[in-house]
Design a protein with these regions (language model features):
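Intrinsically disordered, low-complexity regions enriched in acidic/Ser/Thr/Pro/Gln residues
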Residues: 1-81
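Buried hydrophobic positions in well-ordered alpha/beta secondary-structure cores of metabolic enzymes
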Residues: 21, 109, 167-169
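Protein maturation boundaries and topogenic segments
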Residues: 23-32, 105, 112, 121
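General beta-strand structural signal in soluble alpha/beta enzymes
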Residues: 30-33, 88-90, 117-121, 135-137, ...
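Ligand/cofactor pocket segment of small-molecule handling proteins
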Residues: 106-141
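Acidic, glycine-rich flexible loop/linker segments
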Residues: 140-178
C-alpha cells in the first residue's frame, strides 16, 4: 500500500478499522486484534499505521551471539523495508523482568522509521521518548535489567494476535489489529 494511503488510515480509530475488516471477512470478529489489557503512553496522538518489524526478547535467557552483534543486525533489519514501521516485540516471559524499551531504543527506532512499539513486555523513560512515538505495552518497569534480543523477523504471538514481519498494523489507545 502506498505511503499516502496508509497515512489516510490514521483518520480512523482502530475500532472503526476492525468494523471494516469484519465486513470484508467475518473471521476478523474473532482474530487479528489485541484481546488483552495494555498501557498506552500517548492516547491523544494519531493512530499508528505501519508495517510490522518483529522480534523476540528475553531477560532471563541470553543469546549466544554477542549482544552488540545481534543488536546491529536487528537495527539493520528494522531499517529495511517500507515506511512507516511499527516495532512488534514479544517478551518471552509472562512477567517481564526488564525493559528493552526506553529513551535509547525509542529514539533509535524513531530514527529508523518506527512510529512506536507494541509489546507484551515493559517500557520505561516515559518522559524522554520522542514526542509522537507510541508505546503500547503490557506494563511499566524502572529497570532495563539484562534484556537480550533472541531473534527477529519471525512470527510473534501475544495479546491475542499473531503478527508476521511486514504485516500491516493499525493501532491506537483501543488496541491493535493486523
Amino acid at each position: 500500500m502506498k505511503y499516502k494511503k496508509l497515512l489516510k488510515l490514521q483518520r480512523f480509530d482502530t475500532p472503526t478499522i476492525c468494523n471494516g475488516l469484519e465486513l470484508l471477512d467475518a473471521s476478523f470478529k474473532i482474530k487479528g486484534y489485541s484481546k488483552e489489557k495494555f498501557f498506552c503512553l500517548n492516547p491523544k496522538i494519531k493512530p499508528m499505521v505501519g508495517y510490522a518489524k518483529t522480534a523476540k526478547i528475553s531477560s532471563l535467557k541470553h543469546n549466544k551471539k554477542t549482544k552488540n552483534s545481534i543488536r546491529m543486525d536487528y537495527y539493520e533489519y528494522v531499517n529495511e523495508g517500507d515506511y512507516p514501521k511499527i516495532s512488534v516485540i514479544y517478551d518471552q516471559h509472562k512477567n517481564p523482568v526488564g525493559s528493552f524499551w526506553g529513551e535509547v531504543n525509542a529514539n533509535i527506532h524513531h530514527k529508523l522509521g518506527c512510529l512506536g512499539v507494541i509489546t507484551n513486555g515493559s517500557v520505561r523513560d516515559l518522559d524522554v521518548i520522542p514526542k509522537n512515538f507510541q508505546f503500547l505495552s503490557k506494563t511499566l518497569s524502572p529497570s532495563h535489567a539484562e534484556v537480550s534480543l533472541m531473534e527477529f523477523g519471525t512470527k510473534v504471538k501475544f495479546m491475542g494476535m499473531e503478527i508476521k514481519d511486514n504485516d500491516l498494523i493499525h493501532a491506537d489507545v483501543h488496541g491493535a489489529v493486523s
